[in-house]
UniProtKB/Swiss-Prot annotation:
Part of the 30S ribosomal subunit. Forms a bridge to the 50S subunit in the 70S ribosome, contacting the 23S rRNA. One of the primary rRNA binding proteins, it binds directly to 16S rRNA where it helps nucleate assembly of the platform of the 30S subunit by binding and bridging several RNA helices of the 16S rRNA. Forms an intersubunit bridge (bridge B4) with the 23S rRNA of the 50S subunit in the ribosome. GO terms for biological process: translation. It holds the Pfam family Ribosomal_S15. It comes from the Bacteria. SUPFAM superfamilies: S15/NS1 RNA-binding domain. Signal peptide: none annotated. Keywords: Ribonucleoprotein, Ribosomal protein, RNA-binding, rRNA-binding. Belongs to the universal ribosomal protein uS15 family. One of its GO terms (cellular component) is cytosolic small ribosomal subunit. GO terms for molecular function: rRNA binding; structural constituent of ribosome. The gene is rpsO. This is Small ribosomal subunit protein uS15.
Amino acid sequence: MALDSAKKQEIVTKFGRGENDTGSSEVQIALLTKRISDLTEHLKVFKKDHASRLGLLKLVGQRRRLMRYFKRKDKDAYLKLVAELGIRDNI
C-alpha cells in the first residue's frame, strides 16, 4: 500500500529538517508509521490477506530498527517524535 505523493510530501515537510529531507530518521519513521497504520486498517477488513500481513511485519521490523538507531543517536528528539506520532516507546 503505497502513499500518494501529496501525503508523503506533507509528512516530509512536517517531520523533515528541510523541504526535501527524505532521508532523516524522523521522516523515515513517520513514513513507515503511516504505511503501517494504513496496512493495519486494510488487514482489519481483509483478514485472510496473509501476504500483506507478512509485509506489515517487515515494515514493523524496519521501523523498530530505525527507532532503535534514532534513540541511541538523539534521545530527546526520539521521545518528541514518539509522542507526536502516538506510538509506544518499547525499544
